[in-house]
């Protein structure tokens, strides 16, 4: 985003996702730790809020003060051509589909669990943290090169149909 390069967003970016701030996660976790009714049960600890991937990436771009150059690419294309990156499980099996959680189970055991950090605020905080901590900004030239190849392939496909 900072360099104005295309940002690959799987599919059309409209699937819903949830991001839970660590402070909000901690409220749920601590509430379950000493609760005997939690023993032997599985819980997910998430916010009730959802955003599309388009909204998530736009929020990050806004926090950076940069325009989002979104490049929507079919998830199965990314999975097939992921090379060294396993997009099958994480993308096709998880992030490409809308995920909205029912938090009623944890709220029965931890009734005061209220997520107070919105997804947008959490994303802005994360961006600011990363900008102020250069050690978190680890370049990955191999992944950048792969993303460039995907962007180039999409541009070639577009040009092939524009010629008609």
Task: Go through each PLM region and give its residues.
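Residue-level signal for the nucleotide or nucleotide-sugar donor/cofactor binding architecture
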Residues: 20, 51, 101, 117-118
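Generic structural signal for alpha-helix termini and adjacent loop/cap motifs
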Residues: 4, 35-36, 109, 129-133
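Basic, glycine-/proline-tolerant helical and adjacent loop/strand elements
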Residues: 114
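Substrate-positioning beta->alpha
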Residues: 10-33, 40-41, 55, 121
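A short, charged helix-loop
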Residues: 3-10
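Mid/C-terminal beta-alpha module of Rossmann-like enzyme folds, strongest
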Residues: 31-91, 103, 108-109, 125, ...
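Glycine/small-residue-rich pyrophosphate-binding loop that anchors the diphosphate of NDP-sugar donors
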Residues: 16, 95-98
């Amino acid at each position: 985003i900072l360099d104005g390069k295309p940002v690959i967003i799987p599919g059309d970016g409209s699937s819903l996702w949830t991001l839970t701030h660590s402070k909000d996660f901690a409220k749920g976790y601590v509430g379950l730790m000493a609760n005997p009714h939690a023993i032997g049960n599985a819980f997910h600890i998430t916010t009730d809020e959802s955003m599309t991937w388009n909204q998530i990436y736009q929020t990050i771009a806004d926090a950076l003060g940069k325009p989002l150059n979104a490049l929507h690419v079919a998830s199965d294309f990314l999975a097939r051509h992921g090379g060294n990156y396993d997009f099958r499980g994480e993308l096709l099996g998880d992030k490409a589909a809308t995920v909205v959680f029912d938090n009623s189970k944890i709220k029965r055991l931890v009734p005061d669990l209220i997520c107070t950090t919105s997804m947008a605020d959490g994303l802005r905080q994360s961006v600011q943290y990363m900008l102020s901590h250069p050690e978190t900004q680890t370049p990955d030239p191999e992944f950048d090169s792969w993303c460039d190849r995907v962007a180039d392939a999409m541009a070639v496909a577009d040009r092939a149909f524009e010629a008609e």
